[in-house]
């Protein structure tokens, strides 16, 4: 990517950005992981969880959600000001699952947010440790990306549901900072901007007054974040147009949707990080592993090694397939919801199937679900190889892809060609090239027309044996190109509902 030199690496975003060398970054990320681990150990003690119960991913999710809620300033303020019946704004909680008399029972716990904040700060040497909180948000976001297809949200903003490969991070809260912005897909940014513009169209005062000035600053910042993700001059110029508009309206929405479509072929740069559940970090810390001393990276071998040696369990509903549940969580752990399934199968060493073929619902259990027939099983989160996570979209080229998802967003920096359905994508670009962005549109369409199927992305990059910690011997995988490469293929995954 051309501008790589001017950007901060995401470890720097993760660490408040003073330019640090690799060792300092690894130590700093390690410190963040230590804090999450220590917090989780303490919460398991508070909740009186057995070792097995502490390694249950559903319990991990509840504990993570409690601390995120405890630190959600804006929502907490809102709840104080708009009290709703039966909800104590000062408390947070959720379902905790325990093994009682040979079966799983659900217990609803409630804690003071103040108490949770105290435990979190204590585990993080007195700091608020916002980076650790963001890390958990990204893990939840990656899990949502793998579990749900955002068809409805896409359609509501006037986008095509087949653009789901652009929607990474679409459920990340606004407060997720620079690290959160780095992992958001092109479609996610476009959707946030369209929502904003629509509010401006419907509400005369949206851009006016002191609040409007803040809104305008946020709008321009989001435009700049999106611009920074595009890799071609024409796409960036188009973002300048959208940003500089005096009174953003339908023309800007058109331009944004156009640029999102173009990203199916001219892919943007989106960061990928392996963020694991707290119940992985906790046991590692309690076994005496010192992440800060050893150093840790979210984009290298470390998360793979950690998962090789972790035991994580999950509740399984009566007609779910534990192997499928494992695949769902494995993909979430590596931020790989929109990666090519053929590459994922190669790295994982077992076949990775499209979402619609998986007999599993989401990981979280709803409060009205019956616990009587719940079983639990071990999640298989190990891998055959490891690969470096990418923050670039790779070169852009074409190959047969599917009806449901018509492009991929690469997660791993591994040589291959990136599939997309060129005829389908290009069909959306008939006609409309008039207006003030016509020259950019023409240029973008020309580049898309020129994208070639035989072009290889990430040339020379490969996967590595797990024993090859220094990444010295890349293994370039070979694929059966006739196979289906998209995860949300003609899909019936559940919708994500807030």
Curated annotation (Swiss-Prot):
Annotated keywords: Capsid protein, Helical capsid protein, Host nucleus, Host-virus interaction, Ribonucleoprotein, RNA-binding, Viral nucleoprotein, Viral penetration into host nucleus, Virion, Virus entry into host cell
Annotated segments matching region Disordered: 1-21
Single biological process term from Gene Ontology: symbiont entry into host cell
Motif window: Bipartite nuclear localization signal: 198-216
Domain of life the protein comes from: Viruses
UniProt keyword RNA-binding, yes or no: yes
Sequence motif Unconventional nuclear localization signal, location on chain: 1-18
Keyword DNA-binding (UniProt): no
SUPFAM superfamilies, sorted: flu NP-like
Chief location of this protein within or outside the cell: virion
One GO MF term attached to the UniProt entry: structural molecule activity
Basic and acidic residues: bias regions: 8-21
Signal peptide coordinates: none
Subunit structure: Homomultimerizes to form the nucleocapsid. May bind host exportin-1/XPO1. Binds to viral genomic RNA. Protein-RNA contacts are mediated by a combination of electrostatic interactions between positively charged residues and the phosphate backbone and planar interactions between aromatic side chains and bases.
Functional note: Encapsidates the negative strand viral RNA, protecting it from nucleases. The encapsidated genomic RNA is termed the ribonucleoprotein (RNP) and serves as template for transcription and replication. The RNP needs to be localized in the host nucleus to start an infectious cycle, but is too large to diffuse through the nuclear pore complex. NP comprises at least 2 nuclear localization signals that are responsible for the active RNP import into the nucleus through cellular importin alpha/beta pathway.
Stated family: Belongs to the influenza viruses nucleoprotein family.
Protein name: Nucleoprotein
């Amino acid at each position: 990517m051309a501008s790589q030199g001017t950007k901060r690496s995401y470890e720097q975003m993760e660490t408040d950005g003073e330019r640090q060398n690799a060792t300092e970054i690894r130590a700093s990320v390690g410190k963040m992981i230590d804090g999450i681990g220590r917090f989780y150990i303490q919460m398991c003690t508070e909740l009186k969880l057995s070792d097995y119960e502490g390694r249950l991913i559903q319990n991990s999710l509840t504990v993570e959600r409690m601390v995120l809620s405890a630190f959600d300033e804006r929502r907490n303020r809102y709840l104080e000001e708009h009290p709703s019946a039966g909800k104590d704004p000062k408390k947070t909680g959720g379902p905790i699952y325990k093994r009682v008399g040979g079966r799983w029972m659900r217990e609803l716990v409630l804690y003071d947010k103040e108490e949770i904040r105290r435990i979190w700060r204590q585990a993080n040497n007195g700091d608020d440790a916002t980076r650790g909180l963001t890390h958990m948000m990204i893990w939840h976001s990656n899990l949502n990306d793998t579990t749900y297809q955002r068809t409805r949200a896409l359609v509501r903003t006037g986008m095509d549901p087949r653009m789901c490969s652009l929607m990474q991070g679409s459920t990340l809260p606004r407060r997720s900072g620079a690290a959160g912005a780095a992992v958001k897909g092109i479609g996610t940014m476009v959707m946030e901007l369209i929502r904003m513009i629509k509010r401006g169209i419907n509400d005369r005062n949206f851009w006016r007054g002191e609040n409007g000035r803040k809104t305008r600053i946020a709008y321009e910042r989001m435009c700049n974040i999106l611009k920074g993700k595009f890799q071609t001059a024409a796409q960036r110029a188009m973002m300048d147009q959208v940003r500089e508009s005096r009174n953003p309206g339908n023309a800007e929405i058109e331009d944004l949707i156009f640029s999102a479509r173009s990203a199916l072929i001219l892919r943007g740069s989106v960061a990928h990080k392996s963020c694991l559940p707290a119940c992985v970090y906790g046991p590692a810390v309690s076994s005496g592993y010192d992440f800060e001393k050893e150093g840790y990276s979210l984009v290298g071998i470390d998360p793979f090694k950690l998962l090789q040696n972790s035991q994580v369990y999950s509740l399984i509903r009566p007609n779910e397939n534990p192997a499928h549940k494992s695949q769902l969580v494995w993909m979430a752990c590596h931020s790989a919801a929109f990666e090519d399934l053929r590459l994922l199968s190669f790295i994982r060493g077992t076949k990775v199937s499209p979402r619609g073929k998986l007999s599993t619902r989401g990981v979280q259990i709803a409060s009205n679900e019956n616990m009587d027939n719940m079983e639990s099983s071990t999640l298989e989160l190990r891998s055959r190889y490891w690969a470096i996570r990418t923050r670039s979209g790779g070169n852009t080229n074409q190959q047969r892809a599917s009806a449901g998802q018509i492009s991929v967003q690469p997660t791993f920096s591994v040589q291959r060609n990136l599939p997309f359905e060129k005829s389908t994508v290009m069909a959306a670009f008939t006609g409309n090239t008039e207006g003030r962005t016509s020259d950019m549109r023409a240029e973008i369409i020309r580049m898309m027309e020129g994208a070639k199927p035989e072009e290889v992305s990430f040339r020379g990059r490969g996967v590595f044996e797990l024993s090859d910690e220094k990444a010295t011997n890349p293994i370039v995988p070979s694929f059966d190109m006739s196979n289906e490469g998209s995860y949300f293929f003609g899909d019936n995954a559940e919708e994500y509902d807030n």
